Amino acid sequence: DKYEAIPHIPRYADKDGYKPLIFTNQICKLRKDKHGWYVKFPKAVLQAGWVRDRYDLGKMDLHEQKLKEVRLIPNGDTIKLEIVCEIEIMEPTITIHEATRVAGIDIGVDNLTAIAFTSGHRPVLIKGNEIKAVNQFYNKQIAHYRSLLRTGKKDSKGIHQTKRMKRISEKRNRRVKDILHKASRKIIDLCVEEGIEVIVVGNNAGWKKRIHMGKKNNQTFVQIPFRTLIEMIKYKGEAAGIRVVVCEEAIQSKASSIDEDQIPVYGNDVTHTFTGKRIKRGLYRSKNGILINADINGASNIIRKVYPCMPKRERWSRGTVNVPVTCI
């Protein structure tokens, strides 16, 4: 409950602490040589000893980008360089309610995302194995070093985190963010290829605080930053001219999308009767015996949340019940 309380007024900043340093495009420039793109700072800044003369940007393609500002952000024992560029966003040509080509995304753990399309494309699963492996290895490392650090000490005595543990945490965070960037980019590329007009993503506010799946499963679920993934899908979709709608998803995986069962509302204690059921992990059977991937069934129900009046023949093509394509 303390995490949902009204936040306190911030204290004064530490005069000896680290703060973000922001350079406008009047101070620093983007340049390119045979080694690729890099950030160039003026001599006055270099003489002050704040930064190096250049920061290489690797394989970033910045031909169409207009630099707005460069930020140096304190991040633990390191400094993070952020480049803010202005890009042109494609304006959607239709409204949300006019769309007929829609993609529904169900976010989970074993399958990071399950994507159903109304365009006839086979549904797609993006597996969550990689991000689970990263978190499991991270937990194992942190538990090992914490046991060495805290053995024989009371909770109020001594330090609780070393520099090595901080580096391990920062590396884990970078790897998870990289996985989410690649997954969200794959989703948007698929939607652009299929001419998708609207993406509907399921999300429940506060679901991590109220989850009860056992200690081990809770840890796996809570350690995946689902909200970060949703925000990545939103801004990348908007840049591609695709509208992104985030809706409450409730326990939509229990309702049969093929039989058009009523979808429950999250937090509502009303008892519902469903015509189909999940017969094993990852497999759902409808009233008429049609088998469908359970997560794809959930993704299809997410579309129904926003488009309940869409004609059934447009909403459920044969592609919905096909074996989904697995990628990443």
Each language-model region and where it sits:
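Nucleic-acid substrate recognition interfaces
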Residues: 1-328
